[in-house]
Regions:
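Basic/polar phosphate-binding segments, predominantly the helix-turn-helix DNA-binding elements
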Residues: 166, 170-175, 183, 201-243, ...
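Basic, amphipathic alpha-helical hairpins
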Residues: 145-156, 171-180, 195-209, 228, ...
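N-terminal regulatory/effector-sensing and dimerization cores
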Residues: 22-120
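Amphipathic alpha-helical segments enriched in hydrophobic/aromatic residues interleaved with Lys/Arg
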Residues: 2-11, 110-166, 170-171, 196-198
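N-terminal positioning helix adjacent to the helix-turn-helix/winged-helix DNA-binding module
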Residues: 135-138, 142, 163, 185-196, ...
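A short, N-terminal "cap"/entry segment at the start of jelly-roll beta-barrel domains
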Residues: 1-34, 40-41, 123-130
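Hydrophobic/aromatic-rich alpha-helical bundle segments in the mid-to-C-terminal region
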Residues: 22, 42-43, 89, 151-159, ...
């Protein structure tokens, strides 16, 4: 049994929330708790940059031909926001976990302090922006301290942020620490793609072109396309389309917009084109 599961069940019980699934902020900035009481089939999902830690149940992620299993044995680190497909598997107990936002300033500070010791300088840069990291040893201990701090408001303020600092530090030192390290290396293709992704998520309503994004990334269109697909598992156009469709789905489900309103809200010039692509 996961050593995190009892703490997550305790947190779930403290919410007094009857919903079968949900997400809620915790007393630690940038840390949210999520739960799902039932299995869910493979479906599209948009993940922002962060760490996804599952202590009970399991998720299976699918991205560009790759498959990620994250559960009590491994967490998922996302150096860039990615739209991929996700499946939720539960046994007798609900899926429980936390999400930790990644603060760029925190990552930059750690890299500035420990760059030489990390051993990443001069090595080949990372390709994928999403990787699993084993939940064991010091990383598991730091996560346990974070969850324990949520029992008390003062602990959440004093101990929680320090535990988050250590979690990010431990991930940076892990087998896939480059996913975070390369975000701070501004001249790499990976960092350029990360900046392009920020632009796409900020301006997804606009008529963005690949040539424009490639120019801003100081790459040719073909080089940008290759680098983008290596990091996200999608071509730039596929990524932008999926992002718009997922944003539209959220607008339909949670904001009460109609189909035509949702289409124009996310940048489609034609509601009929949006309807065709949404049905696919």
């Amino acid at each position: 049994m996961s050593t995190l599961a009892p703490l997550l069940r305790e947190l779930r019980a403290s919410l007094h929330d009857d919903r079968t699934s949900g997400v809620t902020e915790t007393g630690v900035p940038g840390v949210s708790f999520f739960w799902i009481d039932h299995a869910l089939p493979r479906s599209p999902l948009l993940y922002d940059t962060g760490l996804v830690i599952v202590g009970q149940g399991r998720k299976i992620g699918y991205l560009g031909g790759r498959q990620f299993r994250y559960d009590a044995e491994s967490c998922l680190v996302l150096g860039v926001p990615v739209p991929f497909e996700c499946e939720v598997q539960v046994d007798d107990e609900p899926l429980l976990g936390i999400r930790v936002d990644l603060d760029p300033a925190r990552i930059h500070a750690l890299v500035a302090k420990f760059a030489a010791q990390l051993g990443f300088e001069g090595a080949e840069t990372t390709r994928s922006g999403v990787e699993p990291v084993a939940m064991r040893g010091a990383l598991l201990d730091a996560t346990r301290r974070l969850l324990e701090s949520l029992r008390d408001p003062m602990d959440s303020q004093a101990v929680g942020p320090a535990a988050v600092d250590e979690i990010v530090y431990r991930v940076l030192r892990s087998e896939h620490g480059r996913v975070l390290y390369d975000l701070t290396q501004h001249r790499t293709h990976y960092a350029s793609v990360a900046r392009a992704l920020e632009r796409m998520h900020r301006d997804y309503r606009k008529a963005l072109t690949i040539d424009e994004l490639a120019h801003e990334s100081a790459m040719s269109a073909s080089s940008f396309h290759r680098a983008f697909k290596a990091v996200t598992g999608e071509s730039p156009l596929q990524y932008l389309k999926k992002t718009r469709l997922l944003k539209a789905k959220a607008a339909l489900l949670f904001e009460g917009l109609g189909v035509e309103e949702a289409a124009y809200e996310v940048g489609y010039a034609s509601a009929s084109q949006f309807s065709r692509e949404f049905k696919r």
